[in-house]
Amino acid sequence: MLALIESALGIEEARSIAQARGVFRLAFGSGDYRRDTGTSMDDLAMAYPRSRLVVASRIGNLPGPIDGPTVGSSHPILREQSEMAVALGLTGKLCLDIEQLPVINEAISPTKSDVTWARDFLADFEARGRVIRDGSDLPRLGRAQKIDRLATAFGITPI
């Protein structure tokens, strides 16, 4: 089940929802949440509920949550909101119009330079026998693997 979280209570219960049997992903019903709470669409105002969903998803061992849709046809606003969602740890965005897809896909895709870094890191890691050298290798390995998976999914090649 894709659990659509649309209220203050839903945000506060996101952890238990993420751990519920059958739930495979959380999504943010941002418009209904704003109506429920009186919150503006401002990035700062929306950071808390988005972050709660990211943390709840992690605790529930789910993929990163899906952000709510952007209303309107302004691609700069859509791009900005998509980039903010990604910066907070969300991994997708609901769409209201098929014309939003290319903008969202570009915003959530890794850059070519990120892909180059990731593949170089992974190649070096393999070349040294998959040995973890220090405490920073594990987080970098996880980041590199995530970037590589996304690059493969989006068909992005390194520089």
PLM region spans:
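Expand to "…catalyze enediolate/carbanion chemistry for C-C bond making/breaking, isomerization
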Residues: 1-159
